């Protein structure tokens, strides 16, 4: 009796192996399909996470830029407030300076009776102007300068052979700047130039 399997005995084994391979193949296909679905889910989650991260980075960058802008604006506002905090106070001092100038104009420095008063007012005024200049207040005396409507207020215009047209020929009241910003315009008389020459005459 031979121990070799016959074709009849081999057929059920082959069939069982074929079924087992088919089942394994089907199981592998199911696992592969599930793995593909899981990969797609993970890819979608990764894309969503990357988009959320990009959005957060954008929001963070915008917030940082806005914070920097606020800091810059705040520093500028503080600097402006510091520079011009004295504006109201400086405006209150201008009439005092004007009165000292009028006192000097109304006093004769050659008259022995008023010479001491003149010198006292003159020294006081020089000291006062030096003090206010330390805080950014500067006097504008545009005598002989070209008229500038940003810093001068014209009281009137007159013909003058001594001054070219559009030149400040007389300062009625000096102007003032506070840190290069106009505090009060200078009140001026502006020249229209010399008299016109009649060509036909």
Curated annotation (Swiss-Prot):
Q: What's a single GO CC term here?
A: cytosol
Q: Name one Pfam family in it.
A: GrpE
Q: Which InterPro entries does the annotation name?
A: GrpE, GrpE_coiled_coil, GrpE_head
This protein's source sits in the domain of life called: Bacteria
Among Gene3D superfamilies, the record links this protein to:
3.90.20.20, Head domain of nucleotide exchange factor GrpE (2.30.22.10)
Q: Give the GO terms filed under biological process for this record.
A: protein folding
Principal localization reads cytoplasm
**Localization, UniProt:** Cytoplasm
GO terms (molecular function) for this protein are: adenyl-nucleotide exchange factor activity; protein homodimerization activity; protein-folding chaperone binding; unfolded protein binding
Going by the UniProt record, its keywords in alphabetical order are:
Chaperone, Cytoplasm, Stress response
Do you know which HAMAP family this protein is assigned to? Answer: GrpE
Q: Which NCBIfam families match?
A: PRK14139.1, PRK14140.1, PRK14150.1
Per the entry, what this protein does is:
Participates actively in the response to hyperosmotic and heat shock by preventing the aggregation of stress-denatured proteins, in association with DnaK and GrpE. It is the nucleotide exchange factor for DnaK and may function as a thermosensor. Unfolded proteins bind initially to DnaJ; upon interaction with the DnaJ-bound protein, DnaK hydrolyzes its bound ATP, resulting in the formation of a stable complex. GrpE releases ADP from DnaK; ATP binding to DnaK triggers the release of the substrate protein, thus completing the reaction cycle.
Q: Which PANTHER family match?
A: GRPE PROTEIN (PTHR21237), GRPE PROTEIN HOMOLOG, MITOCHONDRIAL (PTHR21237:SF23)
Q: How does it assemble?
A: Homodimer.
Its family remark reads:
Belongs to the GrpE family.
Q: What is the protein name stated in its UniProt record?
A: Protein GrpE
**Organism ancestry:** Bacteria, Pseudomonadati, Pseudomonadota, Gammaproteobacteria, Alteromonadales
